[in-house]
Amino acid sequence: MVRLEKNDPLMLARQLPIKSVALILAGGRGTRLKDLTIKRAKPAVHFGGKFRIIDFALSNCINSGIRRIGVITQYQSHTLVQHIQRGWSFFSEEMNEFVDLLPAQQRVHGENWYRGTADAVTQNLDIISRYKAEYVVILAGDHIYKQDYSRMLIDHVEKGARCTVACMPVPIEEASAFGVMAVDENEKIIEFVEKPANPPAMPTDPTKSLASMGIYVFDAAYLYELLEEDDRNENSSHDFGKDIIPKITEAGMAYAHPFPLSCVQSDPNAEPYWRDVGTLEAYWKANLDLASVTPELDMYDQNWPIRTHMESLPPAKFVQDRSGSHGMTLNSLVSGGCIISGSVVVQSVLFPRVRVNSFCNIDSAVLLPDVWVGRSCRLRRCVIDRACVIPEGMVIGENAEEDARRFYRSEEGIVLVTRDMLRKLGHKQER
């Protein structure tokens, strides 16, 4: 493979994304989000008032200069496919730009869907190889972060790596959920273990482990060779973290890329932001953080915009009811099409077309699109799924036993409410 000159970072930053294709793994079920992902894949879950989770990986690609993207789907893909078709159809075929949807089609192994993350790429190799890319960027479609992939590509080329893994320190008590690595002084990965029961600590900080973020850069030809070999191995689980990365590490061809080098943030002194919103509490907390005075993730950075499907909606409206009570909000995100009538909304996130009727108190709540809240309701520490109709006078988040009986309540006390749960309680969901 022809290597670009290493003494011109600006040239590398322009050329490497053009020579690359990004593959976003977007087929995950997200079972830890409970009923929130029964009817949609985790990357299609709403986030941040107007976005879907996958919008962050897609926006990172566009902002990094990568305009050849494959989205690999599987579980409950309709909502995700519809969102991408509606919101990400602005690419130019004449310029060889595209977002290619790659659903599981059981072409390779007949009876099998994707057997692992690596197999998801393997089953689409006949399509991916036609992209004729020199580099392949593998991404998870279910994380919240801002990253300039061109900087990671530069790091990959300058180190002469065949595979580069983005990494960041995590608390050692949380590291069992990740692939954990050890690196030498040149950032070559010398050991890699997927989800170890006893994660090794970093030599420089015994309270942290160096974790893989599930973001990889490969030399394309090398990746295809590895995947074809892995596909023939009956003992493999066909997973990047469990099989592919450890094998490359043993061969001495894998390098680490510290996430702070490519993390995009407005405040250079802030901690690099990357979240796996895989649990209900993490999802709720990450949404509410955006409504705080100084959120950890800057959504207002015009130099690194997060794109999404834009609906034609009127502005949010706050009105007083007939009794004279004013609609008020504080430290909240309220999206287009919302109407707050004679109620108070505090430290909450309201997605498009939410209607809050009179005498309600909404505190620390996430209300997904088209939620209707009847009069005199009190909602606290909860996530209300799309199009739920909350009946008049309902109280959520104040009585742990009652919440657990009627809805799903996490160990941390976050309550998830869906239309099916409300129907089982006898509440009609049509209005």
UniProtKB/Swiss-Prot annotation:
<feature type="binding site">
    <location>
        <position position="386"/>
    </location>
    <ligand>
        <name>AMP</name>
    </ligand>
</feature>
<dbReference type="InterPro" id="IPR056818">
    <property type="entry name" value="GlmU/GlgC-like_hexapep"/>
</dbReference>
<comment type="function">
    <text>Involved in the biosynthesis of ADP-glucose, a building block required for the elongation reactions to produce glycogen. Catalyzes the reaction between ATP and alpha-D-glucose 1-phosphate (G1P) to produce pyrophosphate and ADP-Glc.</text>
</comment>
<keyword id="KW-0021">Allosteric enzyme</keyword>
<feature type="binding site">
    <location>
        <position position="40"/>
    </location>
    <ligand>
        <name>AMP</name>
    </ligand>
</feature>
<dbReference type="InterPro" id="IPR029044">
    <property type="entry name" value="Nucleotide-diphossugar_trans"/>
</dbReference>
<feature type="binding site">
    <location>
        <position position="39"/>
    </location>
    <ligand>
        <name>beta-D-fructose 1,6-bisphosphate</name>
    </ligand>
</feature>
<dbReference type="GO" id="GO:0005524">
    <property type="term" value="F:ATP binding"/>
</dbReference>
<keyword id="KW-0548">Nucleotidyltransferase</keyword>
<keyword id="KW-0119">Carbohydrate metabolism</keyword>
<comment type="subunit">
    <text>Homotetramer.</text>
</comment>
<feature type="binding site">
    <location>
        <position position="212"/>
    </location>
    <ligand>
        <name>alpha-D-glucose 1-phosphate</name>
    </ligand>
</feature>
<keyword id="KW-0320">Glycogen biosynthesis</keyword>
<feature type="binding site">
    <location>
        <position position="179"/>
    </location>
    <ligand>
        <name>alpha-D-glucose 1-phosphate</name>
    </ligand>
</feature>
<dbReference type="Pfam" id="PF24894">
    <property type="entry name" value="Hexapep_GlmU"/>
</dbReference>
<keyword id="KW-0067">ATP-binding</keyword>
<feature type="site" description="Could play a key role in the communication between the regulatory and the substrate sites">
    <location>
        <position position="113"/>
    </location>
</feature>
<dbReference type="InterPro" id="IPR005835">
    <property type="entry name" value="NTP_transferase_dom"/>
</dbReference>
<dbReference type="Pfam" id="PF00483">
    <property type="entry name" value="NTP_transferase"/>
</dbReference>
<feature type="site" description="Could play a key role in the communication between the regulatory and the substrate sites">
    <location>
        <position position="74"/>
    </location>
</feature>
<feature type="binding site">
    <location>
        <begin position="194"/>
        <end position="195"/>
    </location>
    <ligand>
        <name>alpha-D-glucose 1-phosphate</name>
    </ligand>
</feature>
<feature type="binding site">
    <location>
        <begin position="429"/>
        <end position="431"/>
    </location>
    <ligand>
        <name>beta-D-fructose 1,6-bisphosphate</name>
    </ligand>
</feature>
<dbReference type="InterPro" id="IPR023049">
    <property type="entry name" value="GlgC_bac"/>
</dbReference>
<keyword id="KW-0547">Nucleotide-binding</keyword>
<dbReference type="InterPro" id="IPR011831">
    <property type="entry name" value="ADP-Glc_PPase"/>
</dbReference>
<dbReference type="GO" id="GO:0005978">
    <property type="term" value="P:glycogen biosynthetic process"/>
</dbReference>
<keyword id="KW-0808">Transferase</keyword>
<protein>
    <recommendedName>
        <fullName>Glucose-1-phosphate adenylyltransferase</fullName>
        <ecNumber>2.7.7.27</ecNumber>
    </recommendedName>
</protein>
<dbReference type="InterPro" id="IPR011004">
    <property type="entry name" value="Trimer_LpxA-like_sf"/>
</dbReference>
<dbReference type="GO" id="GO:0008878">
    <property type="term" value="F:glucose-1-phosphate adenylyltransferase activity"/>
</dbReference>
<comment type="similarity">
    <text>Belongs to the bacterial/plant glucose-1-phosphate adenylyltransferase family.</text>
</comment>
<dbReference type="InterPro" id="IPR005836">
    <property type="entry name" value="ADP_Glu_pyroP_CS"/>
</dbReference>
<feature type="binding site">
    <location>
        <position position="130"/>
    </location>
    <ligand>
        <name>AMP</name>
    </ligand>
</feature>
<feature type="binding site">
    <location>
        <position position="52"/>
    </location>
    <ligand>
        <name>AMP</name>
    </ligand>
</feature>
<keyword id="KW-0321">Glycogen metabolism</keyword>
<feature type="binding site">
    <location>
        <position position="114"/>
    </location>
    <ligand>
        <name>alpha-D-glucose 1-phosphate</name>
    </ligand>
</feature>
<feature type="binding site">
    <location>
        <position position="46"/>
    </location>
    <ligand>
        <name>AMP</name>
    </ligand>
</feature>
<comment type="pathway">
    <text>Glycan biosynthesis; glycogen biosynthesis.</text>
</comment>
